[in-house]
Amino acid sequence: VSLGVAIKGSEGIVLAADSRVTLGAQHEGGPRFVVNFDNATKLLTFSGDENKYIGAVTYGAAVIGLRTAHSYIPEFEVSLGAGNRPTVLKFSKRLSDFFLQRWNEEMPKDYSGPGMTFLIGGFDPKDAYGKVFIVEIPGHPAPIQRNPGDKDFGMTW
């Protein structure tokens, strides 16, 4: 079980995650092998001054193909390019589009396990309070805002 949490409070946003990744493999007709790693990076930060106000947490499916979400971040950052500071919603859409494309390229069409979930939190220019969005790849890629508004604070997991 993987854990990711986003808390939107009146004094800021908290993003947290565990660090365990569980991977399994099975040869046809053979036993299933399960391996645990306790050093995965599931709290994602992004380079560039325009992106330092946004972070993300991932949980659910540990990998897309053979790679963790964290291993894709350099490619995602290149796809962002340099420029103006994005809103949290726009950033969430771009993150979702990027990972949905990778999922469709790498994952088997008949995959029936859990998806990869992202909680994206950050601050828009001139807003007093942060925003949190949830994205589920591949099932629900459209970002959904959690605890919207200036008086709705709470936790998402």
Give the ranges of each region predicted by the language model.
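N-terminal nucleophile
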Residues: 1-157
